[in-house]
Amino acid sequence: MKANLPTSEYPRVVVVGGGFGGITLAEKLAKQPFQVVMLDRHNYHTFQPLLYQVATGGLEPDSIAFPLRKMFGNQKNFHFRMTRVDRVDTDKQEVITTLGPISYDYLVLATGSSTNFFGNKEIEENANGMKSVPEALDLRSLILQNFEQTHETDNISERDLLMDFVVVGGGPTGVEMAGALAELKLHVLPHDYPELDFNLMNIHLVEGGSRLLAGMVERSSLDAQKALEKLGVDIHFNERVTEFSGRE
């Protein structure tokens, strides 16, 4: 396979990553004398702030995934290739991809971030992250599987485990996820699973610091805390998760 990129009289800017940074740069270069080549493993941009809605069933994936080619369809100097970048050869000014080497005059690495497990391999292996549509769908499936399995057991301890949810991190995503789970508990799941007692469902939000939304003003932190507590979320401050076996 080859990238089959057209030649251009303009310098080539290769942008690795179709996230917020990559698409913002590509938009700014729309009418500039550059050939813009965007590379990404997926052919869509994910609006990550709403992944929690996909994970909890509030939105379908196509509501937050936008085709990159369509986004730049009117930009003649833009070219997209779906590929994985394995390494960069700075001497030859090439990125080595699954489509072969792609030369560049300017290279921008906008690959985004990954879930920070703080070096804890056990948690990394057993916990669920939420940085992509597939991960959000995995979470949705796991949530629903838990309630299906709750139907199938008479073991009280097992039932308690299946109906307990722990969200780690009191930043925007953690707060939104905990709130969405609480809304599910109150308004959605009792209708879908009328045989289950949702008073047994517990939602915990664990935050290593002394308040939620630490990057925001304190008023926002207090408002978020009050809203979650009103929804029945148990918030644990100044605590860190040190072990997770996949069950406890």
Label each region the model flagged.
Residues 75-89, 229-244:
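A conserved beta-strand/loop element that lines the FAD pocket in flavoprotein oxidoreductases
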Residues 13-20, 27, 119-121, 230, ...:
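Localized chelating/binding microdomains
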Residues 2-79, 86, 165, 172-215:
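Beta1-alpha1 glycine-rich phosphate/pyrophosphate-binding loop at the start
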Residues 51-57, 124-128, 219-220:
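Short glycine-enriched, charge-decorated loop/helix-capping segments at active-site entrances
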Residues 130, 134-227, 231, 235-237:
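Predominantly flavin-linked oxidoreductase catalytic cores and closely associated redox partners
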Residues 1-10, 78-166:
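FAD-binding core/adjacent interface of flavoenzyme oxidoreductases
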